[in-house]
Amino acid sequence: MKDSVLKDKRILAVDDEPDVLEVLREEITMAVPTCVVDTATSYDKAMELLASCTYDLAIFDIMGVRGFDLLRIAVNRDYPIPVVMLTAHALSPEFLKESIEKGARAYLPKSSLGHVVPFLEDVLTYEYGDVWRRILKNVEGIFSSSRGPYWRKPDEDFWKEFDEKIGKE
């Protein structure tokens, strides 16, 4: 069995729900014991950790911890941190678009936490376009069910340009 790309990595996970952080930590460290997962339940604690540690990857909840503010800070550092935006209540085309525009590397519904390890491995392994094509394949079904088949229509130009950027057919 080959080593995980998460081996010896350090991840920052930020969510205002301690249960979610515990699931993330357990899922990741059970699969990859040498991966360190630091957690924060607030924006302030996350800022403290970002200032004192070096991270290979970050996972930020969109709601409750100022996830978009943390995203902006993480991607605008001298050494940008790849960021996965995590969401349950903010699972919408609007928040997906904002995540993309602000530089997120990926977008993960909380309902997919059971698959977080292979998801994070993909984020660190695959190119930007490959990761986003996989994510869109997943969320398009969710959005089509909840919003109808024309969920892209309000931001049609953005989605067309993004599809071209990631090489989506």
Q: For the regions a protein language model found, what residue spans apply to each?
A:
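Conserved acidic segment of CheY-like receiver
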Residues: 2-28, 39
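Active-site residues of response regulator receiver
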Residues: 15, 58-63
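Acidic, metal-coordinating helix/loop segments flanking the phosphotransfer/catalytic sites
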Residues: 25, 39-57, 65
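Short amphipathic alpha-helix used as the core "switch/output" element in two-component signaling
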Residues: 48, 63, 68-81
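Two-component signal transduction core modules
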Residues: 58, 83, 107-108
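Alpha4 helix (beta4-alpha4-beta5 surface) of REC/receiver domains from two-component response regulators
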Residues: 69, 90-118, 136-137
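Hydrophobic/aromatic residues positioned on beta-strands within the core alpha/beta folds
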Residues: 86-88
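C-terminal output/effector regions of signal-responsive regulators
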Residues: 125-169
